[in-house]
Amino acid sequence: EQEKPDVVHICTPHYLHVPMAIYSLERNINVFMEKPPAISFDQLEELKKAAAKSEAQLGFCYQNRYNASIRAAKDLIDSGKAGKVLGARAFVTGCRGAAYYTESGWRGSLKTEGGGVLINQSVHTQDLLCFLLGDPTTVDATMTNHHLKNVIEVEDTLEAYIDFNGVHASFY
């Protein structure tokens, strides 16, 4: 209460992101958040309302947008030099073992993590698809728990077909 930093960088377990961000925004302190911004749609709406009322700025860390190769691809797409984008494929091949979830005290739970591979491991790849291709117009997805059924309650596998205004992408 006595200090007023220029910015707060929130890099805590997911379930703490929104309460900490709202606390800071209500005090007009700029907020920079790690992913995910929220663990539910309702939380995201609360965060948006707090940001709209605040004089402070709210930002999210999607750092892969600034990789040189991604910037070059974005420039080629936006300039038309790459031609028309017809489709895309994105694969997240990493796999987390049981210890990643069980030793954290909060991962693997809908209440505290908010989801699994969708909002944790693959979120940066999803962001790059949107950054390069625009906002999705339709999404057809299946999520399941193939590998850690008796360990976590969130999904560990996601398959999606995403349409970006006529550009079709497969995501796994």
Each predicted region: which residue ranges?
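Glycine- and other small-residue-rich loops at beta-strand/loop junctions that grip anionic moieties
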Residues: 10, 36, 62, 117-118
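Alpha-helical elements of Rossmann-like donor-binding domains used by nucleotide-donor carbohydrate transfer enzymes
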Residues: 7, 19, 46, 72-75, ...
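Beta-loop-alpha module in the N-terminal Rossmann-like domain of NAD(P)-dependent dehydrogenases
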Residues: 1-50
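A short helix->loop->beta-strand "cap" motif at the edges of active sites that frequently abuts
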Residues: 27-29, 54-57, 166-168
